[in-house]
């Protein structure tokens, strides 16, 4: 049920929802605030982001030459910077585990962006305690 709602929420946010391909999804898990992630979850995000950053460094000659970057690289860079800001806020604020606030579901997916380019991402969807309403989403690019 919540996994289905998370997928519907994802589809509603996409430029081309018919192109959506779900790679994997988690079962609903308890959430303790919309900015609290377990150490394992944060470690997993940082590992994925490190791989993406490494790819970007190679493609842009350590970001010294982005003038010739293709649309895919520019889009990936934008998604990576957005995710990095969010992850840094989580880490530096060191949000303590709060009271149980609802549920979270993680979806790994592939889709096509507004430029028609295929991309992959990991999306976290936070629900209220009833598991009916989406409170927040958070996304990082996948390599």
Question: Which residue ranges define each predicted feature?
Answer:
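Cystatin/cathelin-like cysteine-protease inhibitor module
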Residues: 1-143
């Amino acid at each position: 049920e919540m996994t289905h709602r998370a997928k519907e929420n994802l589809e509603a946010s996409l430029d081309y929802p018919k192109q959506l391909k779900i790679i994997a999804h988690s079962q609903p898990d308890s959430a303790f605030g919309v900015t609290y992630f377990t150490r394992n979850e944060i470690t997993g995000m940082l590992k994925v982001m490190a791989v993406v950053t490494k790819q970007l460094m190679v493609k842009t000659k350590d970001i010294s030459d982005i003038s010739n970057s293709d649309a895919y690289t520019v889009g990936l860079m934008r998604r990576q910077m957005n995710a990095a800001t969010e992850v840094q806020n989580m880490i530096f604020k060191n949000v303590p585990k709060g009271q149980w606030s609802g549920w979270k579901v993680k979806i790994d997916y592939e889709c096509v962006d507004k430029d028609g380019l295929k991309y992959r991402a990991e999306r976290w969807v936070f629900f209220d305690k009833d598991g009916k309403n989406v409170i927040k989403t958070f996304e990082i690019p996948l390599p």
